[in-house]
Swiss-Prot record:
Top-level taxon in the UniProt lineage: Bacteria
Species, as recorded: Streptococcus pyogenes serotype M6 (strain ATCC BAA-946 / MGAS10394)
Quaternary context: Part of the 50S ribosomal subunit.
GO cellular component labels: cytosolic large ribosomal subunit
Family: Belongs to the universal ribosomal protein uL22 family.
Function comment: This protein binds specifically to 23S rRNA; its binding is stimulated by other ribosomal proteins, e.g. L4, L17, and L20. It is important during the early stages of 50S assembly. It makes multiple contacts with different domains of the 23S rRNA in the assembled 50S subunit and ribosome. The globular domain of the protein is located near the polypeptide exit tunnel on the outside of the subunit, while an extended beta-hairpin is found that lines the wall of the exit tunnel in the center of the 70S ribosome.
Protein name (database record): Large ribosomal subunit protein uL22
Length: 114
């Protein structure tokens, strides 16, 4: 049987737009786990907090479920898919209204041994 060398964590329906989340994910893709956590700590962005939590969850999954060592882990895959959009309306002049889309994101982080 093949040795499992990667672990995954997901955060679903996060109230940050996918476009803004992808900007932060691009910073950590391919980095060592310790470096990625340091980058996220100093990124002043709402998405960075969510991604940091998801990354820590993926690390915990790797250590507890698959017995991998944190020192050997690398962020191998990260992606942000679009979640359900909350549609709202903003009242405007003369009784009209403008649509507002409050976008959500499904964040996925995969860590693997290098």
């Amino acid at each position: 049987m093949a040795e499992i060398s990667s672990a995954k964590a997901m955060a679903r329906t996060v109230r940050v737009s996918p476009r803004k989340t992808r900007l932060v994910l691009d910073l950590i893709r391919g980095k060592k786990v310790a470096d990625a956590i340091a980058i996220l700590k100093f990124t002043p962005n709402k998405a960075a907090r969510v991604i940091e939590k998801t990354l820590n969850s993926a690390i915990a999954n790797a250590e507890n479920n698959f017995g991998l060592e944190k020192a050997n882990l690398v962020v191998s895959e990260t992606f942000a898919n679009e979640g359900p959009t909350m549609k709202r309306f903003r009242p405007r002049a003369k009784g009209s209204a403008s649509p507002i889309n409050k976008r959500t994101t499904h964040v996925t982080v995969v860590v693997s041994e290098k």
